[in-house]
A protein has these predicted regions:
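Intrinsically disordered, low-complexity regulatory segments
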Residues: 66-74, 183-184, 192
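Amphipathic alpha-helical interface surfaces
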Residues: 89-93, 106, 116, 120-121, ...
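PTP/DSP superfamily signal
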Residues: 100-105, 126-192
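Glycine-rich, flexible N-terminal cofactor/catalytic loop recognition
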Residues: 20-63
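Active-site donor-binding loop signature of nucleotide-sugar glycosyltransferases
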Residues: 5, 51, 70-74
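Helix-loop module immediately N-terminal to the HCX5R catalytic loop
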Residues: 72-106
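Catalytic cysteine-centered active loop of the rhodanese-like fold, especially the PTP/DSP P-loop
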Residues: 98-128
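N-terminal polybasic/positive-inside topogenic patches
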Residues: 3, 7-15
Length: 192
């Protein structure tokens, strides 16, 4: 069921991941698409993964306890003046995702909806489905979105945190690089 769940979305930067029988979904979008994505999906939880998280207003329909802001730059190695994704960041993301009750959708966003958010969504898919093959998930992402470019550092940290023994990084290699775009396009991944 790749590519069909968000056909009604007017904004080109939303992604949905179906998470199982009850059909809760993880929607991934850009900052620009956040209000519309939350409104259209009825999401109860929002995960913000970007620099300058203070600029992100929590959608009024989302409770303060259900909005996690994780401040990190979209970089793959330590750089002066930037905040590299860290083990602490990934622990926060994974704990938040595991605490989501799946009663209503979760929205994960970064600035453009291409790198940090898709990496966090990939990590969430692996965390919520520990027996699902990483390459299968990555191939579905690539098939659904030629521009998805999950941040390799985030994926590597999640791989270690989830005990995937490098399989998530090998899945990124299998996935290949994304096409260059300013913002992401909609796509759907079935989790199980």
């Amino acid at each position: 069921m790749v590519g069909t769940a968000l056909s009604a979305f007017a904004h080109p930067t939303a992604l949905a991941i179906i998470t199982g029988e009850r059909s809760p979904m993880i929607h991934v979008c850009s900052l620009a698409a956040l209000p519309e994505t939350v409104r259209l999906t009825g999401a109860s939880h929002v995960l913000t993964v970007m620099a300058n998280v203070e600029q992100v207003a929590r959608p009024v329909s989302v409770l303060p306890a259900n909005h996690l802001k994780v401040s990190m730059d979209d970089i793959t190695e330590e750089m002066d003046g930037f905040v590299a994704p860290s083990e602490t960041h990934i622990e926060q993301v994974l704990n938040f995702v595991r605490g989501w009750d799946r009663g209503a959708p979760l929205v994960v966003h970064c600035y453009a909806g291409i790198s940090r958010s898709t990496a966090s969504a990939f990590a969430a898919a692996c965390a919520l489905n520990p027996n699902r093959d990483e390459i299968e998930i990555a191939r579905k992402i690539r098939t659904a979105s030629p521009i998805a470019s999950p941040n390799r550092r985030i994926v590597g940290l999640a791989d270690r945190a989830l005990g995937r023994n490098g399989r998530m990084l090998r899945a990124l290699d299998e996935m290949g690089p994304g096409a260059m775009m300013v913002e992401g396009r909609p796509f759907v991944i079935e989790l199980e």
